Amino acid sequence: MQNKIILLLTLCFLNTYLLANSDKTLKDIAPYPLPTDSQKRYVIHLPTESNEEKLKVELQATKNAMKDCNRVWFGGKLETKTLEGWGYNYYIIDQVSDQPASTMMACPGIKATIKPVSVFLGDETFLRYNSKLPIVVYAPKEVELHYVIWHQNDIINSAKEG
C-alpha cells in the first residue's frame, strides 16, 4: 500500500513538472535536420486557438537590398519536404536570386538605401494553422523570415450563378 502511495505522489509531481515545463524543443518533437552551413532554421510555435480551421499562416521572407522609389523584389522558391518516417512537413526557401528585380522609374532627389526587400516565394506560402506542430523553415543566412496569421471572418458570401 505504501508503495502505491509513493508511486501516486511521484506521478502527480512528475505530471506537474511536465505541465510546467511544456515548452518542447524541436528535437523533443521530431528529428528535424540541422541547417547546412549556408542556412539558418526558423521554428514557429503557434498558440492554441479555438477555431484553428478558420486560420491560415502566411510565410513572408525578406532580404536586404538597395531600395529607392522603385518596386524591388527577389525571386525565390518555397519547397515543402516531409520528415521521413514521421510525416511532418518542413519548408525550404531556396533559389533566392542574388540580384533583385526592379521597376526602372527615375527617382530624382531620392537616395537609395539598404532596406528589407520581399522575396517572392510563389503561391504556396499560405499554410494550415496547426498549434500542435511547429512550422520549421530553412532559409539562406541572408534571408529573414516573418509570418502573418490570417483570420477568416464570420461573413460568408454566396456566389451568384451566371
From Swiss-Prot:
GO MF entry, a single one: serine-type endopeptidase inhibitor activity
Gene3D superfamilies documented for this protein: Ecotin (2.60.40.550)
SUPFAM superfamilies attached to this UniProt entry: Ecotin, trypsin inhibitor
Family label: Belongs to the protease inhibitor I11 (ecotin) family.
PANTHER family membership: ECOTIN, PTHR35890
Name by which UniProt lists this protein: Ecotin-like protein
Organism of origin: Rickettsia felis (strain ATCC VR-1525 / URRWXCal2) (Rickettsia azadi)
Lineage: Bacteria, Pseudomonadati, Pseudomonadota, Alphaproteobacteria, Rickettsiales
